[in-house]
A protein has these predicted regions:
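Ubiquitin-like/PB1-type beta-grasp interaction modules and other compact soluble beta-rich domains
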Residues: 1-77
Length: 78
């Protein structure tokens, strides 16, 4: 049976833990992509499996099934 043009395949999802909470997110996200997916803008410190991910590497480090991430969103103030 041919596919309909308006139907799309669902995006595969993976199970991870973010700040102690289980989540399912799209497969193939980088750490930066995960931050965007979660709606976190600006600076954020991210630890992946107990290892800090430098900000310069957040766009290249992939989030993988079973990862445990701790995210601290940095905000300014006075």
């Amino acid at each position: 049976m041919p596919r309909r043009a308006n139907m799309t395949e669902p995006t595969p999802r993976i199970a991870i833990v973010v700040n102690g909470e289980p989540r399912e997110v799209p497969h193939g996200l980088t750490v930066r992509g995960l931050l965007e997916h979660l709606g976190i803008a600006g600076l954020a410190a991210v630890e992946r499996n107990r290892v800090l991910v430098p900000r310069a590497q957040q766009g290249s480090v992939l989030v993988e099934r079973g990862d445990a991430l701790e995210i601290v969103h940095l905000v300014g103030g006075g």
